[in-house]
């Protein structure tokens, strides 16, 4: 241990700032003894001295209060602050009045002199901090948590009750000090036992390593009595503002915080006798972790043990290791504060986790559902670049000021409701090697280095270069068959092994050596690509590439494919059903082009082999569902077969095998959610939203006319036909759709919770107005970039609170007509909710510019299905009255097509739809 520093007065000419720097330099290794200023030579504005806590010494600066005096209480608070940061496991929380201060006086016989008033402290003194004998052991055990709302990107569990934290974002609370996670409902029950491991600093590292000197002032004690009164000041530099002065609290200064249970309750509980737990076998209805080893309690029932008194949960194997610290049933104001109090209670509507069962399917894709879209939407605040950086700062949610002007609703994101699927790397080489072939146009057998990936077969000149002879796209391969006798084989030449047929040429691949001159050594495959073994491996590899999504373990026959014998093709266009048609002979599926995934399958990109037309192919694995749900798998196909509308995605055909269903649809550009999230502000302007919503409503009107309710309407299921700023949109994904009559109700579980009406969430009967609620949510998320409801509150209560639903940011920029339409769509009572035609007639959608944009779209696609001829004269008259320009080509179109039989037929059909819906 080094000798204590020599205390000596500095030179009288030493400036005040230099004296502070010299005092700070005393803690730097190798800087020699610490020079102290002469007593009474206080720098302007405060007294500079050192605080000694055990073996740690810190320079501090005591500032004057507004009355010009010094306060001893501020010195005690400063000492507690140093202990909290350097020794968080021994925090002095609330012990300001139990700290004694002693001044080192080498000239006195008793070196330590008790400091009774602040004036006893002189410039350059060394003050020893001693804990009074009146401090009890319980005082050291009480360390409150710093709880802040946190968004988790992976499933997490409450460290108090052990149950999973449910929800999409802001699922629970995280302590800044110890990093533990809790339910919001558990906040009042959490014991004040924070360990502070996340913000712990090595006790042998001085806080002055940051180049700062601690200061204390009485100016802030009234506003924040429990905060450390610290203001870092760099020697020789200007002092920072008080708002930047709280080290260790810089990150969450503006975030919504929660407080734990009262400290008086902890003192009361510490006086209770701790006894062994009384464990009994328990069955849990929700995912729960062992509160001893923090691992999941696995199983369907009787997963673990629970204490009858305090509800502590653990594994059977962990029970002997649990300490005897049961406090029994602890209640305050009639409420049970034990850890697992709600572990076997079914939650009611309006509680924090009332979506737990409904959202269970969402947890499989929590990492995918909250990727960069969510990070960008949440990053609205700024993190202070303070010295004590949180090691988990990249996973903290950004600072969000809680005020009436800011929306705290869930940010808009892509909600995935399927089993997690990872996207394969594009252009992955599936097989490569030397191979020989000749064609129907050239009988000369050639040898190339073949490389097979997910989209093509490339014939390279050699195995290292990039120059290639030919590329055979897999989408152009019409047939893969074993070798047949051919007249093209030269006399005396060896026959080929298999054939690849395209529209223009047939490739005869491989060479079957009938009479080999010498067998290859050790039965190894010849490197030249000759022989039946190497050809057989290539045939199997190409067959798998042509049908990349066949079930694992299925055999691929070289002759008659096993799928061809049992597959069925249903053509939607002409209602023809063909037996023994394999989808791989008609379409090429690209396994690395995943367009999306839904409740019942994955959607891949594909191509028609003969025409080269791009398609989207949804592949449904029937083995994932019970037999009784197979009818639901075909529900989408059955509905789309009867739908032919420009606003609904076109279904081409369907293939079915015992294991899978292949639904082939037209391929579009993207979806509406991608358009919203990629926009400049993360939300759409009103004129674009009107344009898209009108098209959605027209498609819905056609569905409702046929008594079809979509039941899962959301931006992900609204596809864009092009990348234009004003694109055509089409509805897709009818897996949840239902046939519901005009006055009928259904009760089956449907849809995505974030877009579902309250009657579905409450398991009540619903009708076609369910889709209109979803339209209201789509309008809301399009204009604001957030979901309209917070998961913590009852939907009905939130709707009644206009300040909550429509905070000034961003709703002050949005018209009152849009808000009025949203209010009429988000009606909890179904009979008050707007219908399709009433929504289309709303003033917000009856907009001249929107009508012009829709007419231009109809002119581009060559079909009029959104607007009606009867409105032409009205809008033309409106343009004349308002002095607006009416496009001349629209006048000519209405004059030329107004009297045609086709126009009359379309008009009568549209009129009948409106009358039927009304």
From Swiss-Prot:
Residues 345-355, 387-396 have a biased composition (Acidic residues). A zinc finger (Phorbol-ester/DAG-type) spans 144-194, 276-326. Pfam families: C1_1, PH, Pkinase. InterPro entries: C1-like_sf, DAG/PE-bd, Kinase-like_dom_sf, PE/DAG-bd, PH-like_dom_sf, PH_domain, Prot_kinase_dom, Protein_kinase_ATP_BS. Activated by DAG and phorbol esters. Phorbol-ester/DAG-type domain 1 binds DAG with high affinity and appears to play the dominant role in mediating translocation to the cell membrane and trans-Golgi network. Phorbol-ester/DAG-type domain 2 binds phorbol ester with higher affinity. Autophosphorylation of Ser-748 and phosphorylation of Ser-744 by PKC relieves auto-inhibition by the PH domain. Phosphorylation on Tyr-469 by the SRC-ABL1 pathway in response to oxidative stress, is also required for activation. Activated by DAPK1 under oxidative stress. It is an enzyme of class 2 (transferase). Its cofactor is Mg(2+). Signal peptide: none annotated. CDD domains: C1_PKD1_rpt1, C1_PKD1_rpt2, PH_PKD, STKc_PKD. Phosphorylated at Ser-403 and Ser-407 by MAPK13 during regulation of insulin secretion in pancreatic beta cells. Phosphorylated by DAPK1. Phosphorylated at Tyr-93 and by ABL at Tyr-469, which primes the kinase in response to oxidative stress, and promotes a second step activating phosphorylation at Ser-744/Ser-748 by PKRD. Phosphorylated on Ser-916 upon S.enterica infection in macrophages. Residues 428-547 form the PH domain. GO terms for biological process: angiogenesis; apoptotic process; cell differentiation; cellular response to amino acid starvation; cellular response to angiotensin; cellular response to endothelin; cellular response to hydroperoxide; cellular response to norepinephrine stimulus. Its main location: cytoplasm. Serine/threonine-protein kinase that converts transient diacylglycerol (DAG) signals into prolonged physiological effects downstream of PKC, and is involved in the regulation of MAPK8/JNK1 and Ras signaling, Golgi membrane integrity and trafficking, cell survival through NF-kappa-B activation, cell migration, cell differentiation by mediating HDAC7 nuclear export, cell proliferation via MAPK1/3 (ERK1/2) signaling, and plays a role in cardiac hypertrophy, VEGFA-induced angiogenesis, genotoxic-induced apoptosis and flagellin-stimulated inflammatory response. This is Serine/threonine-protein kinase D1. The lineage of its organism: Eukaryota, Metazoa, Chordata, Craniata, Vertebrata.
